[in-house]
Amino acid sequence: MALSPEKEKALAAAMSQIDRKYGKGSIMRMGEASSKLAIEVIPTGSIALDIALGVGGVPRGRVVEIYGPESSGKTTLAQHIIAEAQKMGGVAAFIDAEHAFDPVYAKRCGVDVDNLLVSQPDYGEQALEICETLVRSNAVDVVVVDSVAALVPRAEIEGDMGDSLPGLQARLMSQALRKLSGAISKSRVVVIFLNQLRLKIGVMFGSPETTTGGQALKFYASVRMDIRRIETLKNGQETIGSRTRVKVVKNKVAPPFRQAEFDIMHNEGISRAGNILDVGVELDIIRKSGAWFYLGEDRLGQGRENAKQFLNENPALADEIERLIRAHAMAAPISIAASKADDVVDDAGLFEE
């Protein structure tokens, strides 16, 4: 609806005043801002998860939470996101609150450890201040905080072992996210919080599992991913990796409740070749006949492991298949089973600010 000349003039004056007072771009028409508001992403290193996220990766300028049980692949997934950001020419930082960063394994996941920024803070406030400084620098593309459970408030560290300080960590997270959210959006950085699970005592109905750090992170996160190990992969008696399932339990940039499965191998992290095979078969780009895998009429190998090895030995072919998968999936997203409502972590019963 067209505005009258008087209203148009008054609106232009108001917008001009806001821009002068708060800076250019403080207010704008959506049509003018469409190019700035387009969702930019960083791939996750798993094409199945990129498809499940609906936009091809984790969105820039947003908070992302990855949670799950111990040894489920949280850090591995975060390191693959770091590796993808570095491949795109970006800078990544890893805030190691758990003091357990393994540079050898990170290198296997594709991380350029020589150019990775690593910090091992002494307490929670220091970790979050470092995170804020990096975000406000506008020079970093990914910041990973490992983990929320290890962000121990300074008062708790300086107190006695038996002191009860309920809600202290939740208040710390709530305050930090209030300060960080605007800066994260403006800087286009992805801030990834890794989180652990805890069990609530006395729960009779629903899931007894919950995450640490209060309620704030659940609200501020645009994407929340629940990662679980569902199967152990073996070569004879030797364990060589695990089959992992990720459920996107919250997604503000695409439909939620999709899920993805992929292999995490001990010697390489997320298996790219295995991922390409699985998704390629699901999309009918790769044909499976008996034990054989085919691309068109060309054989890729007999058995999944042989086909994976063939793709690893022919990276140009793997790149071409991945390009076909992305073109097909992004044009018409594949149907990925939604998780049941009771699979989502229940938020009730936590101290929060």
Swiss-Prot record:
Organism ancestry: Bacteria, Bacillati, Chloroflexota, Chloroflexia, Chloroflexales
Keyword Nucleotide-binding applies: yes
Organism: Roseiflexus castenholzii (strain DSM 13941 / HLO8)
Record's function text: Can catalyze the hydrolysis of ATP in the presence of single-stranded DNA, the ATP-dependent uptake of single-stranded DNA by duplex DNA, and the ATP-dependent hybridization of homologous single-stranded DNAs. It interacts with LexA causing its activation and leading to its autocatalytic cleavage.
GO cellular component entries: cytosol
Protein name, UniProt field: Protein RecA
Gene: recA
Family: Belongs to the RecA family.
Binding site for ATP: 68-75
Keywords: ATP-binding, Cytoplasm, DNA damage, DNA recombination, DNA repair, DNA-binding, Nucleotide-binding, SOS response
